[in-house]
Amino acid sequence: MAQDNKATDRRRARVRRTLRARAYGKPRLSVFRSSKQIYCQIIDDEAGLTLAAASSLEKSARESLKTGADVEAARAIGKLIAERATAAGVTDVVFDRGSYLYHGRVKALAEGAREGGLNF
């Protein structure tokens, strides 16, 4: 168990280090997924502010989605974060997948955000 956590921590640190090197002052789209929900937020690291956030726990999302833990929900949340980001004046972001592989729900969220108008 401890070995798995070490590998996850190393992967997360490696991804963040690469992001900071390539960000050029752009905000980052950070993703967190649990077994039942998915969350994302757009963070401006220079100012230390969250510019926009969306999750499958929100009332509007819960009413329209069957569950918060599938690919359809992730795509819908991606579109929602893109709408909120454009309303906040953000169009270019850096995608921060954290320690998660770019597959399944994480990939669906990214594709939904791209469909919604975010560039990364």
UniProtKB/Swiss-Prot annotation:
In terms of superkingdom, the source organism counts as Bacteria
**The keyword rRNA-binding appears for this protein:** yes
SUPFAM superfamilies xrefs: Translational machinery components (SSF53137)
The alphabetical list of record keywords is: Ribonucleoprotein, Ribosomal protein, RNA-binding, rRNA-binding
Q: GO biological process: any one?
A: translation
InterPro entries per UniProt: Ribosomal_uL18_bac-type, Ribosomal_uL18_bac/euk
**What is one cellular component GO term in this UniProt entry?**
cytosolic large ribosomal subunit
UniProt GO MF annotations: 5S rRNA binding; structural constituent of ribosome
| HAMAP family, A to Z | Ribosomal_uL18_B (MF_01337_B)
Q: Which NCBIfam families match?
A: L18_bact (TIGR00060)
Family assignment?
Answer: Belongs to the universal ribosomal protein uL18 family.
Described purpose of this protein according to its UniProt entry: This is one of the proteins that bind and probably mediate the attachment of the 5S RNA into the large ribosomal subunit, where it forms part of the central protuberance.
**What does the subunit comment say?**
Part of the 50S ribosomal subunit; part of the 5S rRNA/L5/L18/L25 subcomplex. Contacts the 5S and 23S rRNAs.
UniProt name for this protein: Large ribosomal subunit protein uL18
What is the organism field in this record?
A: Methylocella silvestris (strain DSM 15510 / CIP 108128 / LMG 27833 / NCIMB 13906 / BL2)
